[in-house]
Each structure stands twice: as C-alpha cells, then as structure tokens.
Amino acid sequence: MGLIYLLHVRAMLNANKISSHGFRKDDRFEVTACATVVGTINDNDSTFELDKQCFSITRSGVFAPRFDLKSGGVLIATARQKPFRNYYTLAFDGKDWTFKAVVLLATQFGLFENDTQRGSVSAGPPLHSLKDITADLPDELPREIQMFLISLFVRQLTAPAN
C-alpha cells in the first residue's frame, strides 16, 4: 500500500517594475503569482490594485511613521515603523507581526511571528533591484496584506536615501 504525501506549496509573488511613460516619475510594479498577473502597485500614489479592487496606503507621522492600509475608506491593517530603522510592526487579525531588514543594505526583509521567521521579501540583483522582487509570504495572510508588505518593501527600495 503506497503512502500519500500532501505537499503544501506556497504561491510566491513576484514584482517587476513597469516601464515609465511621460515626464512624471512613475514607479509602478506588476505583481504575478505563478506567471499570472494578480495586481499592480503604484508607489508614487501609494496605492495598489488587486483583483480589480483598489487599496490605498496612507502615511502619518514623521520620525515613527504609521502606514494604514485602506480599501473604500475602511481600515484593514496598520504597520508602524521604528524611528530611523527598516523595522515595522504589523497588526492584523489579532496578531502582531514584525517585518524587518535581514541584510545590511535592506534588500531583503523577513516577516516574523514572535521570533520565528515565516516569510521574506527580496530585491532583485544589485544593479536591477526593482526587477524580480520575490515575496515568499505565509498563505494565512490574505493577498491584500501580502501586497501591503511588498508595497512597504518597494517604498524602502525607492526611497531617496537608497
């Protein structure tokens, strides 16, 4: 009698910068899962689209900014950044997560639940860091929260200091 093994494979998300058009700086990213487009991130407008639904990210605060994810004016999740660090705490669905840089140049972030790493988001190669961004995040996080984390990561990569 053969054994049946169930293998759970997480759907990795990939984000790639879309070519700019016009005179305006246009940082837009196409996000795919299994080579199928699932959404678009617009870093300039702090928005993303997922399954034809629009989400916005609003920032408040200067030294310890807070980022609110909203859809249709309804608050979905909040991420708070530690002052002057690539370190966020994410409150969602009664759980607290930590999303922080795990390498010196902040080209890779880890997602932690308590002290256990549960996922990661990584930039592409050094000269093309905005291409081939890869997110390996837990399936228990809804896709809009995964897109929120990728958006925060893209914000770090495109910040003037980087």
Where does each model-flagged region fall?
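Intrinsically disordered, low-complexity proline/glycine-rich segments
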Residues: G2-N162
